[in-house]
Amino acid sequence: MDNDKYLKGTTTVGVVCTDGIVLASEQRATMGHFIASKTAKKVYQIDDLVGMTTAGSVGDAQQLVRLVSVESQLYKMRRNESMTIKGIATLMSNFLNANRYYPMMVQLLIGGVDKNGPAIYSLDPMGGSIEETRISATGSGSPMAYGVLEDQYREDIAVKEGLDLAIRAIHNATKRDSASGENIDVVVITKEAFKRLDPEEVKSRRALLN
């Protein structure tokens, strides 16, 4: 049996900004009370300007990443244009709902920038999909992350400030949630590019919070 399916526990956040979005997560994976990994990947690139965060079962999440990545590329080949963020979220929602009697134990954030601007959608294991117009957090550390996000988010926030807000939110969650910890992985998506921040830059920004 694949042990990856039992690696759980996470904090992920998404921040909608005026010029893009920020997706971030910590990198601890737990198996019960055991820290199974300190470098778990939880923020994935789905398309050129689309990313996805995963909280919950690592095995289920990786299967979903492969599925939606392939479907997105096939759509682009057939239509000669990228699928919208809403389209990708709907595709994932339909797949999760079709498997609702054998649910994949994941919470997802799908976000990016398309012709309609920046957007983030949150999805639950049953396929419920909600467009998040401001902020979102998933996983066991989300209550602590929301405390920071709700307090410091502004409607006019740009990605330069949004990435620091995301780092602060996850940093705060790791202090109280035993299933969240280690390094923080941060992705910034604008209409120009999908950029994963260098780990050393994230560490430097995080150090300023202590």
UniProtKB/Swiss-Prot annotation:
Entries under PROSITE patterns matching the protein: PROTEASOME_BETA_1 (PS00854), PROTEASOME_BETA_2 (PS51476)
GO cellular component: cytoplasm; proteasome core complex, beta-subunit complex
Signal peptide: none
A Gene Ontology BP annotation from the UniProt entry: proteasomal protein catabolic process
Enzyme Commission identifier(s): 3.4.25.1
Location of the protein in the cell: Cytoplasm
Function text: Component of the proteasome core, a large protease complex with broad specificity involved in protein degradation.
Protein name: Proteasome subunit beta
Taxonomic lineage from the root: Archaea, Methanobacteriati, Methanobacteriota, Stenosarchaea group, Methanomicrobia
Gene name of the record: psmB
